[in-house]
């Protein structure tokens, strides 16, 4: 008896028609992650410097953040996204570059908000680096 081969059919992602959404930019010292969502918060597209193939110290550059924002914007604009609110989190170098890249891609930015979490004297920070 030969084993039956079951062919799995992959479901194509349906094209959502969203005009207004949000861009969440998380920019750390090591990486930049850009997620574009609809108004509710469901992700339309995402990209990061590491996912694009940047490795090591190049991952934390403004250029890497710019490329991540560009690729995420292209996919989201296929879903009909036109205007976004930008929420920026983190102390990284790619914050401004990612916002500029989203505007250059053709998305209208209606709001820019810094949502970096600030502790009310919470955890002890890591010790200073001595190089």
UniProtKB/Swiss-Prot annotation:
Keywords noted in UniProt: Ribonucleoprotein, Ribosomal protein, RNA-binding, rRNA-binding
Top-level taxon of the source organism: Bacteria
UniProt-annotated stretches for the region Disordered: 1-23
UniProt record similarity statement: Belongs to the universal ribosomal protein uS11 family.
Cellular component GO terms held in the UniProt record: ribonucleoprotein complex; ribosome
InterPro entries: Ribosomal_uS11, Ribosomal_uS11_bac-type, Ribosomal_uS11_CS, Ribosomal_uS11_sf
Entry keyword annotation includes RNA-binding: yes
UniProt biased composition (Basic residues): 1-15
Organism: Clostridium beijerinckii (strain ATCC 51743 / NCIMB 8052) (Clostridium acetobutylicum)
GO molecular function terms noted in the UniProt entry: rRNA binding; structural constituent of ribosome
Family matches, as Gene3D superfamilies: Ribosomal protein S11
Protein name, as recorded: Small ribosomal subunit protein uS11
Tagged with keyword Kinase: no
Biological role: Located on the platform of the 30S subunit, it bridges several disparate RNA helices of the 16S rRNA. Forms part of the Shine-Dalgarno cleft in the 70S ribosome.
Quaternary organization: Part of the 30S ribosomal subunit. Interacts with proteins S7 and S18. Binds to IF-3.
Lineage: Bacteria, Bacillati, Bacillota, Clostridia, Eubacteriales
Entry's transmembrane regions: none
Gene Ontology BP term (one): translation
Pfam family, one: Ribosomal_S11
């Amino acid at each position: 008896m030969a084993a039956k081969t079951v062919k799995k059919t992959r479901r194509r992602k349906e094209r959502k028609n969203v005009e207004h959404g949000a861009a969440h930019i998380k920019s750390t010292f090591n990486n930049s992650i850009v997620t574009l969502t609809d108004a509710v918060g469901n992700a339309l597209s995402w990209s990061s410097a590491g996912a694009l193939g940047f490795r090591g110290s190049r991952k934390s550059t403004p250029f890497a953040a710019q490329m991540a924002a560009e690729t995420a914007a292209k996919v989201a604009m296929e879903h009909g996204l036109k205007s976004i609110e930008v929420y920026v989190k983190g102390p990284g170098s790619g914050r401004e570059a990612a916002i500029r890249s989203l505007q250059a891609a053709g998305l209208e930015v209606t709001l820019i908000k810094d949502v970096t979490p600030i502790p009310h004297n919470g955890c002890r920070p890591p010790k200073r680096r001595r190089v």
